Amino acid sequence: AVADVIVERGYAGATTKQIAAKAGVNEVTLFRRFGNKKNLMRSMVQQEAMRLGGMDLDYSGDLEADLTNIVRVYQQLMVRRGHVLLMLLSELPKQPDLLEVTEMPQAQARHLGTILRRYQEEGKLVEEPPLVALSSLIGPIFMSAMLGSLEATLLQNLVEPQQLVKQFLQGRAN
């Protein structure tokens, strides 16, 4: 319900009353549990980040398999919640207090950066800031979503994980 209302009305335009109505609960219940709209948003983002954290995104020693796994997970995230993520990114310049909401996803990105750094240290990837490498790897997924291809099958067909990893490695593998 949080995602639907905020995507439809924007963060500033969404009210807890609208969110409660969409969720089929009393607004007072939302206030008791979350306190405010930002905490509702934080809870939703944390749930997605925990889902990402539980998807076995750890170093395995197999560079292509790890990169493909990262691409698949982000692709699934964009299919499931891309519209919310894009809305959140567009709202950050206008609502800087929302930056707190992104703490868990930022921690997940740093974790993935440590995996890429390890491959760099092993000489399997060129040296560059790990978050730059991560952005280069998953950037096409975000770009596809920004261009309006959030419809699940289109996004999945537009960005084929193994092909994306091969293209990424053409310029970055040692």
What are these regions (language model features)?
Residues R42-I70, V79, R117:
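Amphipathic alpha-helical linker/stalk segments
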Residues V5-N39, S43:
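Helix-turn-helix
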Residues V126-G148, L158-F168:
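Hydrophobic alpha-helical segments that form the core
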Residues V45, M78-L99:
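Amphipathic alpha-helical segments used for helix-helix packing
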Residues A1-A3, I19, M44-E48, L112:
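Generic hydrophobic, amphipathic alpha-helix propensity
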Residues V79-R80, P96-E122, L131-S135, V159:
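Amphipathic alpha-helical packing segments from all-alpha helical-bundle domains
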Residues A1-I6, Y74, F168:
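Short hydrophobic clusters on alpha-helical segments that form packing/core surfaces
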